[in-house]
Structure formats: structure tokens, C-alpha cells
């Protein structure tokens, strides 16, 4: 099977899932073509079954904004024709599902029809998709897809609530390869904390929805009760809030490490005692799942799909969005009881195993085969 994957190249959840899915399929012998504006962050281009096609947008003075969607549709059309792809998989409704539909119409003129799968990841539905400028286009592109998947039950519910979707949405959760989180040979905790200190960690793109200011406040509250350090991994617009916090709290500067983007995230997660995720919205909570795979319990909000991953009182604790006091108290409770912490570390790993790649990949493979079969049946009716 030859599969075209359309995705963002960034470190965000949708890009990571799309890349890991494509590489896993390539490892099983599928031919996988990535179409994006840049090389996806985690993509191993040395795999002989992986192909990358960069979308280039030519600048032209007439356009206030360069027409990426048109260039994307043209590249999809070209790749499908050149490599005889069997299926397209768009990760994120805008612009990928919309551009893929346009490419499908072009291909139909050549009598080269191809099925399209669209995976909904979150802000394409909960934020971007609900804006009046995009809503109708998002709804249209989803309904024009031949199969639709969502990364959580919560996101499926939101999609059906906000849009008039005429097709079934199949929930296929995000996944991780647990084996990547089992090697701690290079983990050196003493690089970040003293033996008598606990380590809290937060990983995100530091957008406002991640509420990094609450991460900092939680740590400030916890540090008063438990000797601890905070590690923040990621870059984004709210880094200014972090810098402002440090200016206002100079006594905490030596207790907070800012690492930016890191490649071997699992090595840092395995050093940590608690993962903080007070997000305003999370369609699934992939960062929380990665933490659990590294034996790290999660203190989080109950936003979106997080409760489907983080189980209250078992793998960590959840609180209402914005309830910094509750999240602080839960963290103090957990870090003050080594027996409870050890139990939750074990529970977190067991929960992560349920979302292992080996369990989720066959679901995608079956969905692909079914989509292609159904698409061919529909073509014979025309």
C-alpha cells in the first residue's frame, strides 16, 4: 500500500502523531509519502520506504498572503500521479483536508480517484474550526472525507456538537512506542536536582492555552512545602511570561531550568517525579501519555480528552481548569508520600502500555484497508 501523509512539520501533537504513524507503517513495508512545508521534526528520512515532498510557495507581489493551500493541492496532485498512491491521510482539517479535497477533484478529471482519511486532532475543531472565517470550510472538508477519525471521545463529541457531520467518526487514540521510554542508561538526575529534591516538569509549545503561568504558580506553591526543582521544555509565545515570573521571583531562578526544545525527551521525563499539565484545552494529552510512559504521574486539569488518559487517583490527579490551589495541593500530597508516589509511577506506566503503538497501529491498518475497499465499491456504482 502507498500512503500519502499530510501534516504540520512542527513539534505539536498532530505532527508528532502523523510522523510516528508514518514511520511505523514504513517499518512494516508500506510506502509512505510525507507532504508538508518542511521536514517533520521527528522524521527519519533514511528509511527507504519514506519519501518527503516539500511544498514550496512562490512569492508574488500581488498577494498579501502567499497561497499555500493552492501550492499544497498542486503538490498532492503531483505526488499521487507520480507515485500512484492508494490513499491520502490528512492530519488536521485545515488546510490539509481542504487542500486534499481540491487535489481529489483535480485527480478525478484525470480518472485517478483516491480515498481521503482525515484525522481530527483538536484545535482544528475547538479553536480554528469554530471561527466564522473557517467553520463552513472545515465542515465541508470533513464531510467530503471518505473516513474520519478523532484522537479522543471528547474531541468526537465536540466535533458532532459544533458541526453538522454526516459521516461516522471513528475514535483512534494517539499512541506511543513504550520501548523508547524504557532505556534510562544515560539518565543522570543529579544534573537537575539534589538527592533530597523532587523534580516537576512541564512540556509544551508554551501557547496561552497551555497556561504556563499556572505551572509556575503551582511550582511556587509546592516549593514552599517540598524541596523541588522545575524543568520547562519547549518554546513559544508565553516564554515572556516565564521570564517575567523569574524577574518577579528571583529566589526561584536557581530552581527553574529552561531547556527549550530537546530531542531525547524521554531521558528528561524519566528523571521527573510529577508532570504538570494545567491546560485550558487538550484534545487528548499526548504529553501526559509520554510522561506516563516514563513512569511519571500527572497533575492536570480535566480539560478535553485528558481524563481519558490521566485517571483520577490512579495515574495522578485532575482538577477543574484554573484551580491552581487544588493542583498545588495534589502535587504536594503526592510528593510528600514516597509510597504513594511509587505506586502512581507504576500505575502511570501500566496505563501508558494500553496506548502502545503495537495496539493502535493495527487499528489504523484495518481502517485504511476498509476505506480503500469501500471507496472502490462506491466507484463501481458511479
Language model segments and positions:
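N-terminal strand-loop element at the rim of the active site
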Residues: 7-11, 23-68
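A short helix/loop element that forms part of the nucleotide-sugar donor recognition site in Leloir-type
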Residues: 182-195, 247
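Aromatic "clamp/platform" in nucleotide-sugar-dependent glycosyltransferases that forms part
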Residues: 261, 280
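Carbohydrate-associated surface elements
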Residues: 154, 175
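Conserved donor-binding/catalytic core segment of Leloir-type glycosyltransferases
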Residues: 193-219, 231
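Conserved acidic donor-binding segment of nucleotide-sugar-dependent glycosyltransferases
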Residues: 312-313, 317-324, 333-338
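Short hydrophobic beta-strand element within catalytic cores of glycosyltransferases
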Residues: 297-300, 310
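A short, well-ordered alpha-helix in the C-terminal region of glycosyltransferases
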Residues: 326, 333, 340-354, 363-366
Amino acid at each position: 500500500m502507498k500512503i500519502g501523509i499530510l501534516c504540520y512539520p512542527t513539534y505539536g501533537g498532530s505532527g508528532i502523531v502523523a510522523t510516528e504513524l508514518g514511520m511505523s507503517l514504513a517499518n512494516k513495508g508500506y510506502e509512505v509519502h510525507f507532504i508538508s512545508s518542511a521536514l517533520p521534526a521527528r522524521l527519519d528520512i533514511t528509511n527507504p520506504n519514506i519519501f518527503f515532498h516539500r511544498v514550496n510557495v512562490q512569492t508574488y507581489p500581488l498577494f498579501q498572503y502567499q497561497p499555500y493551500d493552492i501550492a499544497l493541492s498542486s503538490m498532492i496532485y503531483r505526488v499521487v500521479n507520480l507515485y500512484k498512491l492508494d490513499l491520502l491521510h490528512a492530519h488536521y482539517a485545515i488546510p490539509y483536508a481542504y487542500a486534499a479535497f481540491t487535489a481529489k477533484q483535480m485527480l478525478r478529471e484525470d480518472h485517478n480517484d483516491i480515498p481521503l482519511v482525515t484525522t481530527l486532532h483538536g484545535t482544528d475543531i475547538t479553536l480554528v474550526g469554530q471561527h466564522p472565517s473557517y467553520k463552513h470550510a472545515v465542515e465541508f472538508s470533513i464531510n467530503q472525507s471518505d473516513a474520519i477519525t478523532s484522537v479522543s471521545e471528547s474531541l468526537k463529541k465536540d466535533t458532532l456538537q459544533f458541526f453538522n457531520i454526516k459521516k461516522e467518526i471513528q475514535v483512534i487514540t494517539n499512541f506511543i512506542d513504550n520501548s523508547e521510554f524504557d532505556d534510562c542508561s544515560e539518565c543522570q538526575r543529579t544534573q537537575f536536582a539534589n538527592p533530597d529534591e523532587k523534580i516537576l516538569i512541564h512540556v509544551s509549545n508554551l501557547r496561552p492555552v497551555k497556561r504556563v503561568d499556572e505551572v509556575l504558580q503551582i511550582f511556587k506553591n509546592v516549593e514552599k512545602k517540598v524541596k523541588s526543582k522545575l524543568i520547562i521544555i519547549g518554546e513559544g509565545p508565553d516564554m515572556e511570561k516565564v521570564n517575567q515570573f523569574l524577574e518577579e521571583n528571583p529566589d526561584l531562578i536557581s530552581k527553574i531550568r529552561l531547556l527549550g526544545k530537546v530531542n531525547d525527551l524521554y531521558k528528561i521525563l524519566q528523571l521527573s517525579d510529577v508532570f504538570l499539565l494545567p491546560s485550558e484545552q487538550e484534545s487528548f494529552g499526548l504529553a501526559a501519555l509520554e510522561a506516563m510512559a516514563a513512569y511519571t504521574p500527572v497533575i492536570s486539569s480535566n480539560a478535553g480528552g485528558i481524563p481519558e488518559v490521566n485517571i483520577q487517583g490512579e495515574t495522578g490527579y485532575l482538577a477543574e481548569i484554573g484551580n491552581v490551589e487544588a493542583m498545588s495541593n495534589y502535587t504536594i500530597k503526592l510528593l510528600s508520600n514516597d509510597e504513594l508516589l511509587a505506586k502512581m509511577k507504576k500505575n502511570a506506566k501500566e496505563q501508558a502500555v494500553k496506548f502502545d503503538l503495537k495496539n493502535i497501529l493495527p487499528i489504523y491498518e484495518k481502517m485504511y484497508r476498509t476505506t480503500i475497499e469501500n471507496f472502490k465499491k462506491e466507484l463501481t456504482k458511479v
